[in-house]
Amino acid sequence: HGPDLSPDDCGRHPPLREEVMYEHILDRLRELASEEGATVSRVGVAVYEEHKDALLRWSAAKGMHHNHRGGLMFHIYRMMGAAEGMLDVYDSLDPELLLTAVALHDIGKLAELDTDDMGTASYTVEGQLLGHLAIGEDMVAQTAARLGIEGEKLLLLRHCLAAHHGIPEYGTIVT
């Protein structure tokens, strides 16, 4: 008989360990949340802490991109790197808003998709009816309410999640 295998031993995986990417993103959100006047990054920290197990294994899609175990984490990790690069170029950007929006932009996929231990994704009823933009925006609004966070920056964060597909043809809720 062969060795005992787990889902971690099989299938496609991102080139970096999911735990490493998760900790990198959460550490960055915590750093932002520790700054005076921080608001939306506190929402990001709470969402990441609450959904750690799913974030570590969820696929980013059923078939479009990063459709494998840990694919969502890898996608977000790479987008965070791109956002950090934008902050180096455009000093007018708000680091807390941009990085929190990137960290949370696809968080609704945790309810839009059901991902098995191998990383195979299928759409949930909620996902088919609402989509991850609406689901993610709602998750953020509920977490912010629970934390007592409100204000314009929260509205901007919610807008980023609702608008991140850019145009209606790609499924954006607002532009």
Q: Positions of the model-derived regions?
A:
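Divalent metal-dependent catalytic cores for phosphoryl transfer on phosphate-bearing substrates
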Residues: 64, 85-175
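Active-site flanking loop/helix segments enriched in acidic
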Residues: 54-75, 118-123
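Metal-centered catalytic cores of metalloenzymes
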Residues: 2-4, 69, 73, 163-166
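A Trp-anchored, charged/polar loop motif used as the substrate-binding/catalytic surface
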Residues: 82
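Extended, charge-rich, solvent-exposed interface segments
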Residues: 2-59
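A ubiquitous short alpha-helical element
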Residues: 10-15, 66-68, 124-128
